[in-house]
Curated annotation (Swiss-Prot):
A Pfam match: Sigma54_activat
GO biological process: DNA-templated transcription; negative regulation of extracellular matrix assembly; positive regulation of cell-substrate adhesion; positive regulation of cilium-dependent cell motility; positive regulation of DNA-templated transcription; regulation of bacterial-type flagellum-dependent cell motility; regulation of DNA-templated transcription
Function: AAA+ ATPase enhancer-binding protein that acts as a transcription regulator and plays a role in the modulation of mucin adhesion and flagellar gene expression. In addition to flagella genes, also regulates expression of biofilm-related genes. Functions as a transcriptional repressor in the absence of c-di-GMP and as an activator when c-di-GMP is present.
Reported phenotype of the disruption mutant: Deletion results in the concomitant loss of motility, mucin adhesion, and the ability to synthesize flagellin.
Gene3D superfamilies: 1.10.8.60, 3.40.50.2300, Homeodomain-like, P-loop containing nucleotide triphosphate hydrolases
Listed name of the protein: Transcriptional regulator FleQ
Binding site for ADP: 147, 177-182, 334, 363
Highest taxon above the source species: Bacteria
GO CC annotation terms, alphabetical: protein-DNA complex
SUPFAM superfamilies associated with the record: CheY-like (SSF52172), Homeodomain-like (SSF46689), P-loop containing nucleoside triphosphate hydrolases (SSF52540)
Entry's Gene Ontology molecular function annotations: ATP binding; ATP hydrolysis activity; cis-regulatory region sequence-specific DNA binding; cyclic-di-GMP binding; DNA-binding transcription activator activity; DNA-binding transcription repressor activity; transcription cis-regulatory region binding
Keywords: ATP-binding, DNA-binding, Nucleotide-binding, Transcription, Transcription regulation
């Protein structure tokens, strides 16, 4: 193993505990066996918590059950991975505990699954220990293209910070349009492979009969139509990152070949006997339930465990509605930067969008913004300008819009420490241009005030508690537009 470690086997079923200890001894794994009552005394025999590779957890009959024991283990070492013996983690367990459960093992465990699970625990442990040894703490806004202050997006950022510059395989889970490729590109950009290529491939968009050639390349004459030799995606990604999007759509025969490459880091082009070595990091993504596919026999379990070393789950947009206003600002800013027009949304329209279900997630929101920018160039969008399916409040319902806005602002402030809260601003590790930062902050607040005031400068100045003439000067400074009826007052 990568260093001297022991497995901590905690099980109140003595017969099962004894049987599993025999299996682990046969595999050459050192373990400490105990029950749920005396685990602290046994763990005290270790020099420190990092000497424990993982915990194999079986029946827990002590007070509070498995959840209480897992909380105790987390207080001892929050980075300690868990392998469950028997049933998988119940759905009602807290998310922070479920995230540390890497696998569940049936008794007697299969040889391959036990080895794969221990391998995942080893990679998981090594990854966290490397980050801890470096003492690296990236600032929360490092991954800037992940827009939002919700708890869900903060958790994604935190997990990305932990795994970015390791070589661990990452499996990104989430509905279509939630930004899985954005996460993959961020992981590559902030890894030690950032100078290497990032090569995406959509496994569901390539016909099954062409997928092998697409991934591994082919030699001239390997099949009808192969008039020249061609490098595959693995070759193109050598030294960098290969992003396998929609991995759940990969046919079973291709899954076997992919598993071999992941295990041996070698492959052959179609029509060639020459074995090539490859050094790539694998990031996979899917919107499908791979565990259900394993049960149905449409996805290989061993491949799943190879890919699922570090899972990251993207929340759907309907579960982080407090991010919608920020996403709108970001999407509009990108349009303006690309000189594709601009629009603004009033408060009622934003509140109406917050009540939409968003089956297409962020992609659906981006398409809506682009559509409205074409239909109402440089206009202020109210509820009446939204397509019918997005109208969930009335423009006149200002009281509802105000209360909803306050609720969203409160949620965002609690999650992210926005101005007005006690949480301090975070200085990026690379530093920043304070003058530019403050100018951007001021411009953003002015724009928010103008949006809330429907573009009326006088009302916006009242919200900002400054003189109207001062606001006009600042708007001229930043090149911001204002309503025609205000221009006549100057």
């Amino acid at each position: 193993m990568w260093r001297e470690t022991k497995l901590l086997l905690i099980d109140d079923n003595l017969d099962r505990s004894r049987d599993l200890a025999v299996i682990l001894n046969f595999l050459g794994e050192d373990q400490l066996t105990c029950n749920s009552e005396d685990w602290r005394e046994v763990a005290a025999g270790l020099s420190n918590s990092r000497e424990a590779l993982c915990v194999l957890l079986g029946s827990v009959e002590s007070k509070g059950g498995a959840v209480e024991l897992l909380k105790q283990l987390a207080s001892w070492d929050e980075y300690l991975p868990i392998l469950l013996i028997g049933e998988p983690a119940p759905a009602d367990w807290p998310e922070e505990l479920r995230r540390r459960v890497l696998a569940s093992l049936e008794m007697p465990p299969s040889y391959n699954k036990l080895l794969d699970s221990l391998h995942r625990a080893q990679v998981y442990r090594e990854m966290y220990d490397q980050a801890r040894e470096r003492g690296r703490s990236r600032e929360p806004n490092l991954f800037r293209s992940l827009v939002g202050t919700s708890r869900a997006i903060q958790q994604v950022r935190q997990m990305m910070q932990q795994v970015a510059d390791t070589d661990a395989s990452v499996l990104i889970l989430g509905e279509s349009g939630t930004g899985k490729e954005v996460v993959a590109r961020n992981l590559h950009y902030h890894s030690k492979r950032r100078e290497g290529p990032f090569v995406p491939v959509n496994c569901g968009a390539i016909p099954a009969e062409l997928l092998e050639s697409e991934l591994f390349g082919h030699e001239k004459g390997a099949f009808t139509g192969a008039i020249t030799s061609r490098a595959g995606r693995f070759e193109l990604a050598n030294g960098g990152t290969l992003f396998l999007d929609e991995i759940g759509d990969m046919p079973l025969p291709m899954q076997v070949k992919l598993l071999r490459v992941l295990q041996e880091r070698t492959f052959e082009r179609v029509g060639s006997n020459k074995t090539q070595n490859v050094d790539v990091r694998i990031i996979a993504a899917t919107h499908k339930n791979l565990e259900k596919m394993i049960e149905d026999g449409t996805f290989r379990e061993d491949l799943y465990y190879r890919l699922n070393v570090f899972p990251i789950e993207m929340a759907p947009l309907r579960e982080r509605v407090e991010d919608i206003a920020l996403l709108l600002n970001e999407l509009i800013s990108r349009m303006e930067h690309e000189k594709r027009g601009s629009i603004r949304f009033n408060s009622a329209a934003i509140m109406s969008l917050c009540r939409h279900d968003w089956p297409g997630n962020v992609r659906e929101l981006a398409n809506l913004v682009e559509r409205l920018a074409i239909m109402h160039p440089y206009g202020v969008i109210g509820v009446g300008e939204l397509p019918k399916k997005f109208r969930h409040v009335d423009d006149e319902d200002e009281q509802l819009a105000s209360s909803l806005r306050e609720e969203l602002e409160e949620r965002a402030a609690i999650n992210a420490g926005l101005p007005g809260m006690d949480a301090p601003a975070m200085l990026p590790a690379e530093g920043l241009d304070l003058k530019d930062y403050l100018a951007n902050l001021e411009q953003g607040l002015i724009q928010q005030a103008l949006d809330d005031a429907g573009g009326v400068v006088a009302r916006a100045a009242e919200r900002l508690r400054i003189r109207r003439t001062t606001l006009v000067e600042k708007m001229r400074k930043y090149g911001m537009s204002r309503r025609d009826d205000d221009l006549s007052d100057d």
